[in-house]
Amino acid sequence: MKYVLTIVALAFLVFSAQPSEAVEALHTYDSMKEDTQELASQYPEIAVYSEHGISTGLDLEIFSVDVALNITELSDEELHALPTMYVDGTHHGNEGMSAEASFLFLQDVLQRSAADPSYLEGKRLVVTPSVNPDGYVLDCRSNWNGVDLNRNYPYMWGMYGTSD
């Protein structure tokens, strides 16, 4: 529980510490993917870009960035033992600002960590800007199959309040 509170406090401090530049336009899926790859490549000691699978309809990659101190030197066991904060965007594809917020959060953490490596000490961050790339591209709430990913997890699938 103390790790959760620490991470929540850290997230609050990151976003409240200083004003950021206004978002003039939302990323497209392609520009988000390209900018996320580019951002991770600027911080090779602490960030690793990876792709995890393909979306159900448009065959788009679901990608993320894993962030930790000396990430390329950590074993899988060491990496998975770190307290981890997971941030994602666009469970609802038509809520593009959630992808922007997760990307800007990643950018801010990487910049701060480069300036002060102790910022990440003993922590891990995983950011997936879009968990619903089909919905993001189509600007619709659900995925390609009409499933609202924010409501339909395995628990009580198909029960009251879920989508088909």
Regions found by a protein language model. Name each.
Residues 1-22:
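Secretory targeting signatures
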Residues 14-18, 39, 136:
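Intrinsically disordered low-complexity regions specifically enriched for long asparagine
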Residues 19-63:
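Short glycine- and acidic-rich boundary segments immediately preceding or forming the N-terminal edge
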Residues 44, 73, 116-117:
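Short, flexible coil/linker elements and helix-boundary hinge sites characteristic
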Residues 55, 69-71, 134, 156:
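Residue-level detector of flexible, active-site-proximal loop/helix-junction positions
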Residues 64-80, 90:
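Short beta-strand-to-loop junctions in surface cap/lid or active-site-entrance loops
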Residues 78-91, 96-164:
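Active-site/substrate-binding loop(s) of hydrolase catalytic cores
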